[in-house]
Amino acid sequence: MKRNVLFLILFGTVYLLNAQVSMITSQFSQNLTKSDLPFSGDRKLYAIGIDDKNTENYFVVSKNRSGADNDELFIEKFSKEGKQFVKSFQYKLTHPINKSLAFVDNRASYSDVDKDGNYESLSIIDQHTSGPESKIEKVIGMIMYQNKAYEVWVSADDNFSQNFYSDNFSQLPTPISKHFIDFWNRLNKP
């Protein structure tokens, strides 16, 4: 009996270790500043260390200054090359009214769907009509695959019922698009 329990524990541990495609680390991401990593925005909203099988990475979301004429949201990935981190991905959204774009960190997905050792992700952004207290006009899902951005979104125009896709979305491999669209379709949207 003891042997069976030990075997199950060992098997479960090995299975979980092999299933782990990335390790999310906080390291210095909580106190990350522009002097640590040159992110594009004036203020950091969110940062997390994500180490996949091939590289150490930091995923940073930042925005332009509060009170600016428009709203700019940046999603960037910094990957370790040698002894330093370099920007390996950047995605930028703009809106004519400040504080109208909101990154939703608790609905993101990080995975290595194609098992190439590099993580893919889905980030969710709520786009409000005129600031954070106004109604949501669009929900955007930005898929990062091989350091390129692909978008899926729903709009208030049709009561958030139909998915729309960026022009390059069809270039995503089917397993990647299926994985993230399945996740996307399970999310509650306004």
Label every model-predicted segment:
Residues V86-L101, D158-L172:
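Surface-exposed loop and turn segments in beta-propeller and other repeat-based domains
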Residues S109-Y119, M144-A149:
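A short, structured loop/turn motif at beta-sheet edges
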Residues A19-A47, E137-I140, M144-P190:
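Acidic, small-residue rich beta-repeat scaffolds with periodic aromatic anchors
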Residues S66-T94:
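Surface-exposed turn/loop modules enriched in turn-prone residues
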